[in-house]
């Protein structure tokens, strides 16, 4: 029972942390967001240059960040549902997690409408939704892999 409660608490805290990260990024003004993206882009380009790769464009980095943060959300949502509703079949958990992720993407873009120097883009909602789906699939596949390696997982 204690292990189940700990897993539920941890999964909920993970979801809340990912949401806080996503929404706090969206609340940044356009100038602050650009400065942060430029700093990350400089670091990524240094690493790529050291590995013999070419530079990454700002728009590509921003889109990759959108996808990655929503992939983390998708993984955390499906994990939370597996912990909180273990009796609910995955075929029912999946649409619930995905819908929650898509609503989060719409909310995220809505926040940006009210952030100075930012705008909302429908294409970002689509990209974020794809990230949610990818994160969910990765989490489910990872769990299946763990079960094959260790039947108690």
Predicted regions and their residues:
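"…centered on the first transmembrane helix and the immediately adjacent amphipathic helix/loop
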Residues: 2-77
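Alpha-helical transmembrane segments of multi-pass membrane proteins
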Residues: 18-25, 101-108, 136
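Membrane-interfacial alpha-helical segments at the cytosolic side of multi-pass membrane proteins
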Residues: 69-84, 132-146
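Internal alpha-helical transmembrane segments of multi-pass membrane proteins
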Residues: 86-99
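Interfacial helix-loop-helix junctions of multi-pass membrane proteins
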Residues: 105-129
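Short, charged juxtamembrane terminal tails flanking transmembrane helices
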Residues: 148-153
């Amino acid at each position: 029972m204690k292990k189940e409660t700990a897993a539920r608490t941890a999964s909920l805290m993970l979801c809340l942390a990912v949401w806080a990260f996503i929404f706090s990024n969206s609340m940044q003004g356009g100038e602050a967001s650009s400065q942060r993206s430029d700093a990350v882009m400089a670091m990524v380009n240094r690493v790529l240059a050291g590995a013999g790769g070419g530079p990454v464009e700002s728009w590509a980095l921003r889109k990759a960040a959108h996808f990655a943060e929503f992939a983390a959300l998708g993984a955390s949502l499906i994990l939370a549902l597996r912990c909180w509703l273990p009796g609910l079949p995955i075929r029912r958990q999946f649409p619930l997690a995905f819908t929650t992720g898509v609503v989060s993407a719409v909310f995220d873009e809505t926040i940006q409408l009210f952030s100075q120097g930012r705008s909302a883009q429908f294409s970002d909602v689509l990209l974020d939704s794809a990230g949610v789906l990818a994160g969910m699939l990765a989490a489910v596949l990872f769990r299946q892999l763990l079960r094959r390696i260790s039947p108690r997982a």
